[in-house]
Amino acid sequence: MGKVIVVGIGPGSYEDMTIRADRALQSCDAIVGYGVYVDLVKERYPDKAFYETPMTQEAKRCALALDLARAGKTAAMVCSGDSGIYGMAALVYELRGESEEPEIEVVPGLTAACSAAALLGAPLTHDFAVISLSDRLTPWETIEKRLTHAAKADLTIALYNPASRSRPAHLKRACDILLRDLPDSRLCGIARNIGRAGESWRALTLGELREAEVDMFCTVTVSYTHLRAHETLAN
């Protein structure tokens, strides 16, 4: 019996990958993941067997890794950012069920909120909330409730999955919810393609964020009341 290692590879660059993640990928027999994430590591580990699945096929991806482990292989399931924060770790455990085999190891990684904050300056310097705007698995009513309470609590908010082709207006809807409790002058930031080709970031207000163009490769921050501009924005 082999094992499944669920590996958080960080935002994209090798420099942002942990030593533990690198060692896990060096030691495995096969690397499984969403095609975009597999492409980020394929060049550095050319001797591995690679298995890719498209977007929305997370269960198939995890089942494949478990099948490889049952066949005696060490399968690394790669996840962007951290393996447990919107990653595949929970689903791998769920699909394995109550059995203790195959063995599962979870390797953490640098999540997008932290790497985006490093680009933008120091927007996460105090308490903060991380909220995904994807309603594929979470009802929008639940997301709206979380946004409302985070705004009322005056937390800095990191927004994951702000938009995609199937939900292009979700960030605008989120901003409308936040604007019920926050001023349109509230400092915000957008980081895109963190650690990858075309990396970029910009600072803007909440009012401007409502009209901004974003995609699934963006991470958004909305600051709390007392964060000063020179703390938030990289020079």
Residue ranges and their predicted role:
Residues M1-I104, S115:
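Class I S-adenosyl-L-methionine
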Residues T225-T232:
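Conserved small/polar residues in nucleotide/adenosyl-binding loops
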Residues V214-Y224:
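C-terminal edge-of-domain segments
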